[in-house]
């Protein structure tokens, strides 16, 4: 099904409950989006649905509304410990967002209860909440949900609770697989009844996703929703009201350009994407100092417990900056994001589309800007062809000033900042080496000296990619970096204590040093082969031991036959000597007399 047009909710071929229509009115959703008008009637008429739609097209309501309608039409009312709907999504931020939307609709249906099962919270608390309050609707991430199914020893029988399941939704299904949740999903699907309605929603279609469709859905209706007004021959994968730009700048000017842009748009809401967690930590801290009078938040995948609060705080802001990795790239709906800035291009082309989709959501206007090095210019043409995502050149950012000396001063004044910068540089280079578009993002063409200047490094780190090379264009600061102290007195005290201990022991710091090696596929294959060798040797040794045992048993049998008179001494000597001939050199079967 394609090219579904949008319209008012009353134009649907199925009737929605009055309370649902009232909530839609309160939320300001007067018109349906194409994906909603396509999916809701099919889902409500007991069809399995596999929907592909551009990011920001309103997929959440396309499954929340029919899920509620299906539960309302049940002949038997759900009991406290019966789960009627299960929604699985890849990230906790997206799960929180869906739970928030579901909560608004459940205000009109007090007979239903929901629970949010995500990482970053105490699983024991989740178990107790489920046991005492129950839940008719579960919104969860795969890891935590799988954990709950295994909590029978704690008195939670979730496997029995889901036997009443009517609706299963896999949201951002392509990313569920990308993030390695396939095994968890298969485990979860094993607990669920076959007689259910299943909806699978994604922004892209992959071969792995097709396998999941075949495994989890029964004769699904496939829906591909295209942006209104886009020709079938060139389906644009980003929202129609998104203005997509790129800007070219040298490595040492890149951060200066970003700071100037953020200063000029400080009254707007902006997302800034970096390629690694270490880059978020470093540049996020720098932006807090360099961009004044703006609320700046940082979020990345290694933050386990803080992420939920940071995400909620930023969503509530009218303006501000969220510095993040791709943990925020999919499905997250943050109100009124004006700009999505991609300081580092993502590791895959499809991620580029999803990052851009954090703005211009559900028909709103939005802008996206990617920062490219001169050597990366061909990426613009690649995106246009590969992802149907055309980019316009952005007029140069004005009032760019050199903030790198200030960044260096921050590193000189606090060892924490110095170490963050070094880690950020190393992680960036490693991420660049593993980029999916390696024909465009070539590590061998990277100007390491210019890059280090752009990171405001005091010296170059020791890493495999730089070994044996000289960089006359990079001038290290004339300072012993070991003398840079932590601003945090406790951390500095611990460092000094550690240094004193090392001196007392007089153990060379490099004694246990393991030489770093550059990442490569060939290296990984060699390592795997090495790991297999000891196992092969062990199997060989095991075979040899078994052979020795068989020979010993054979000798014992011959000796018994001799004692019982079944063979002569001559026969015995002959058979024993023939056995010795087959033994490896160095093995003596005599008694040693």
Swiss-Prot record:
| EC category name | hydrolase
In residue numbers, the region (Disordered) covers 524-545, 569-593
- DEAD box (motif): residue ranges: 171-174
Positions of the Helicase C-terminal domain = 241-405
Q: Which InterPro entries match?
A: DEAD/DEAH_box_helicase_dom (IPR011545), Helicase_ATP-bd (IPR014001), Helicase_C-like (IPR001650), P-loop_NTPase (IPR027417), RNA-helicase_DEAD-box_CS (IPR000629), RNA_helicase_DEAD_Q_motif (IPR014014), SPB4-like_CTE (IPR025313)
Kindly state which reaction or reactions the protein catalyses. Answer: ATP + H2O = ADP + phosphate + H(+)
| Basic residues bias spans | 524-535
Question: What residues does ATP bind to?
Answer: 53-60
The entry's localization annotation reads: Nucleus, Nucleoplasm
Q: How does it assemble?
A: Interacts with 28S rRNA. Interacts with double-stranded RNA substrates in vitro; the interaction stimulates ATPase activity.
Q: What is the protein's known function?
A: Probable ATP-binding RNA helicase. Plays an essential role in early embryonic development. Has ATPase activity and is involved in the maturation of precursor large subunit rRNAs.
Name of the protein in question: ATP-dependent RNA helicase DDX55
Organism of origin is Danio rerio (Zebrafish)
């Amino acid at each position: 099904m394609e090219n579904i047009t949008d319209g008012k909710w009353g134009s649907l071929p199925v009737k929605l409950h009055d309370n649902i229509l009232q909530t839609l009115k309160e939320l300001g959703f007067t018109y349906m989006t194409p994906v909603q008008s396509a999916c809701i009637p099919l889902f409500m008429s007991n069809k399995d649905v596999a929907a592909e739609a551009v990011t920001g097209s309103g997929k959440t309501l396309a499954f929340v509304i029919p899920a509620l309608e299906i539960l309302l039409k049940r002949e038997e009312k759900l009991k406290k410990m019966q789960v009627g709907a299960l929604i699985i999504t890849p990230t906790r931020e997206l799960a929180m967002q869906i739970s928030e939307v579901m909560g608004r609709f459940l205000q009109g249906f007090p007979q239903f209860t929901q629970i949010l099962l995500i990482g970053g919270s105490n699983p024991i608390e989740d178990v107790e909440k489920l046991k005492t309050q129950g839940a008719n609707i579960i919104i969860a991430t795969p890891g935590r949900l799988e954990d709950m199914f295994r909590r029978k020893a704690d008195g939670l029988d979730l496997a029995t609770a889901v036997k009443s399941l009517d609706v299963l939704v896999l949201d951002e299904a392509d990313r569920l697989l990308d993030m390695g949740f396939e095994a968890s999903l298969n485990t979860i699907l094993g607990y669920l009844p076959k007689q259910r309605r299943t909806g699978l929603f994604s922004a892209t279609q992959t071969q792995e996703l097709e396998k999941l469709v075949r495994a989890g859905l029964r004769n699904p209706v496939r829906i591909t929703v295209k942006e209104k007004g886009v020709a079938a021959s060139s389906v644009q994968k980003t929202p129609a009201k998104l203005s997509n730009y790129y800007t070219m700048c040298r490595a040492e000017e890149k951060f200066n350009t970003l700071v100037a842009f953020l200063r000029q748009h400080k009254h707007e809401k902006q997302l800034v994407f970096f390629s690694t967690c270490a880059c978020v930590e470093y540049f996020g801290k720098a932006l807090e100092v360099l961009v004044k009078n703006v609320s700046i938040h940082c979020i990345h995948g290694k933050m386990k417990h803080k992420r939920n609060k940071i995400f909620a705080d930023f969503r509530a802001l009218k303006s501000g900056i969220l510095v993040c990795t791709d943990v925020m790239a999919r499905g997250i709906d943050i109100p009124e994001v004006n700009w999505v800035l991609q300081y580092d291009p993502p590791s895959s082309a499809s991620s580029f589309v999803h990052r851009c989709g954090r703005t211009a959501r559900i028909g709103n206007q939005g802008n996206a800007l990617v920062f490219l090095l001169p050597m990366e210019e061909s990426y613009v043409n690649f995106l246009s062809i590969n992802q149907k995502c055309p980019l316009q050149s952005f007029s140069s950012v004005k009032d760019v000033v050199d903030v790198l000396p200030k960044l260096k001063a921050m590193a000189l004044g606090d060892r924490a900042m110095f170490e963050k910068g070094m880690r950020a540089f190393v992680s960036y280079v490693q991420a660049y080496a593993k980029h999916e578009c390696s024909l465009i993002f070539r590590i061998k063409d990277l100007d390491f000296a210019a890059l280090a200047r752009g990171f405001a490094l005091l010296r170059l780190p020791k890493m495999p990619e730089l070994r044996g090379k000289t960089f006359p264009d990079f001038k290290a600061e004339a300072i012993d970096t070991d003398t840079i102290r932590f601003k945090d007195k406790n951390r500095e005290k611990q460092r000094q204590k550690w240094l004193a201990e090392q001196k007392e022991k007089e153990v060379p710091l490099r004694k246990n040093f393991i030489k770093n090696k550059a990442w490569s596929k060939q290296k990984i294959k060699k390592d795997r082969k090495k790991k297999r060798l000891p196992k092969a040797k062990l199997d060989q040794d095991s075979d040899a031991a078994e052979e020795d045992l068989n020979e010993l048993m054979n000798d014992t049998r011959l000796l018994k036959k001799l004692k019982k008179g079944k063979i002569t001494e001559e026969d015995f000597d002959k058979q024993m000597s023939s056995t010795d001939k087959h033994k490896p050199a160095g093995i003596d079967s005599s008694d040693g007399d």
